[in-house]
């Protein structure tokens, strides 16, 4: 939302929420990917058009530095404390209705202002979506499901980027979140050049950064509603709002051109 539009919305009673952070965890980078990134960055800058046409040279110059920076970031991320041995994590292609609904009920009590994550959402978002296939890391503590992380590998015609789509767990339960994230990264980091994620919760942001994710950009959503109760819900639960890549189309196909 443009700043002018946001100010108009706020004057009409709209509620601007805390930032949603976009993060990236680089694992490696190929010349093809770096070339693509350079073109994307410079294609709207006419005064640098000559550099766009010479990206092969720019890529060769920048590639060693990019790889060195990635190695340094991975070295620092390797110091992240290991997950708690009390948390057991398993991987699945699907989640059953009882497991998902039970966890959503507990999650909603902790994060009441979060967008719908009901079973209907699960089916619509993960089961019936065309083309895309999702994986699920499920965490248990004392045989009780305490968290689910949804992840996605790239399609063959996409950029080689894995996606942390959603984390359905108490954001402040760091043992669970750390275990889930570690399991998902074990899957994605072996084949993906990088992994992306989004979150609006500061506790999750800290866990992601500790795991080697870098902050790319952020933006602040604004809630516009004629319902007073809806506005109050967001105003009174600033710490209980969670946005991720499951909201909107933030995890959809990114074609590598």
Regions found by a protein language model. Give the residues of each.
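Short, conserved catalytic or adaptor-binding loops enriched in Gly and charged residues
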Residues: 76-84
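Active-site/acyl-donor-binding loops of N-acyltransferases
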Residues: 1-77, 125-128, 135, 141, ...
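A conserved beta-strand-loop-helix scaffold within acyl/acetyltransferase catalytic domains
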Residues: 3, 83-169
């Amino acid at each position: 939302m443009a700043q002018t539009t946001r100010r108009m919305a706020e004057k009409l009673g709209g509620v601007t929420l805390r930032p949603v952070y976009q993060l990236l965890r680089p694992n490696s980078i190929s010349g093809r990917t770096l070339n693509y990134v350079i073109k994307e960055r410079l294609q709207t800058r006419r005064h640098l058009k000559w550099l766009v046409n010479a990206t092969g040279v720019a890529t060769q110059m920048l590639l060693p530095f990019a790889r060195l920076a990635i190695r340094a970031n991975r070295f620092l991320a390797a110091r992240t404390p290991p997950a708690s041995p009390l948390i057991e994590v398993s991987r699945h292609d699907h989640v059953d209705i009882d497991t998902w609904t039970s966890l959503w009920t507990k999650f909603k009590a902790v994060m009441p202002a979060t967008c719908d994550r009901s079973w209907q959402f699960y089916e619509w978002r993960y089961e019936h979506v065309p083309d895309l296939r999702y994986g699920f890391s499920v965490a248990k503590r004392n045989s009780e499901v305490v968290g689910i992380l949804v992840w996605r590998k790239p399609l063959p015609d996409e950029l080689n980027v894995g996606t942390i789509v959603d984390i359905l767990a108490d954001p402040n339960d760091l043992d669970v979140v750390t275990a889930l994230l570690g399991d998902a990264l074990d899957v994605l980091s072996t084949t993906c050049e990088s992994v992306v994620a989004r979150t609006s919760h500061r506790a999750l942001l800290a866990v992601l950064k500790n795991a080697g994710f870098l902050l790319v950009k952020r933006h602040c959503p604004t809630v516009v509603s004629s319902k007073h109760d809806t506005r109050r819900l967001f105003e009174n639960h600033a710490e209980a709002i969670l946005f991720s890549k499951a909201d909107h189309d933030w995890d959809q196909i990114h074609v590598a051109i």
